Amino acid sequence: MPQPCRRASRVLVTAVAVLSLAPTPVAAQAESSADFVPVTDAMLQDPAPADWLMWRRTLDSWGYSPLDQIDQENVGKLRMVWSRALGRGNQQGTPLAYDGVLYMPNPGDVIQAIDAVTGDLKWEHRRDLPDDLGDYLGGLVTTKRNIAIYANLILDTTGDDYVQALDVATGDVVWETQILDYTVNPALQTAGPIVAGGKVISGRSCRANATADACVITAHDARTGAEIWRRRTIPAPGEPGDETWGGVPFEERKHVGTWMVPSYDPALNLIYMGTSVTSPAPKFMLGGADKAHLYHNSTLALDADTGEISWYYQHLNDHWDLDHPFERLLVDTAVSPDPAAVSWINPRLRPGEVRKVMTGIPGKTGLVYTLDRETG
């Protein structure tokens, strides 16, 4: 049931306005679910300028807003209109904005719907989490970076290793599906999902006290919660990549997580996710320093319909816990790097040719990589 906001929190969500501008308030959310316009795949692929429908706003993970009402000339005139306390815990959440409502993930699996104009709370959902979660998952279990919206649902991954859907009008649970048993194979779900072609795509940080079966990327039907596929990031004996582990027993292969939010190219129907390190990180403690131990510290391009790995690119064979899970930026651009500015250029590259690329700083090394997102 909805409960009052915890006012004791030190964290605030704020709204600001430019005092000298004519007021152009965002329309308030419709009073009934019958008036709500469901969010479609087309809207996710090309959101209206005022909408922020996912963590980085668009499926290509740009994090860019085309709105231009606030500019260099008037930004100094911004003033607070309202503020609202958020829940206690490790706050890394980004709100969604749609139809005059902010949908805000709070620490500890609390989601709020807030009127964007007034700051009034429309509803709040608090998941009833087990008391022993911290024993299995540690202190980061309260962290939540993002949620997703699709149709008339708010979609989320939970601290107790479920994926759930809430009614956008009420916050009531519509469906929930268990992904893992946290007492057997604990995984931190600090990043929420995206929706790609009606499928809820989510990754997680599998713990060192779990098996390789916790290191999975999953897809669920957004409307029903039925699992469609799951993809391990650590190969089992006999699977492609098994030979890169140097004979390490499967039960000792651990910790290749996908703990940030994926990107998606609907034209190629490929999902792009980055992976973390092994546990332990130094490879001489596993199969040998010369072994790749796939698919750690890699970019994975997955078929959105099947979860099959279309291609992978390993950024480095890591020994120092330098994860590479961060957002992958999808860009169509004329690739023409300055040879003096980069350490390596593909000799097959034709300067000035427009390519579909994946770029950005995917890992903790701070290096920029640019890959062909069709082939890797």
Regions found by a protein language model. Name each.
Residues 73-84, 111-138, 150, 154, ...:
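Extracytoplasmic/lumenal domain signature
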Residues 11-23:
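Bacterial N-terminal signal peptides
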Residues 70-99:
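Active-site-flanking structural segment that lines cofactor/substrate pockets
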Residues 1-8:
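N-terminal secretory signal peptides that target proteins for export/translocation
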Residues 30-80, 233-240:
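Blade/loop signatures of beta-propeller domains
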Residues 23-31:
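Signal peptide processing junction and immediate N-terminal pro/mature segment
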Residues 52-56, 88-110, 136-163, 188-211, ...:
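Repeat-blade elements of multi-bladed beta-propeller folds
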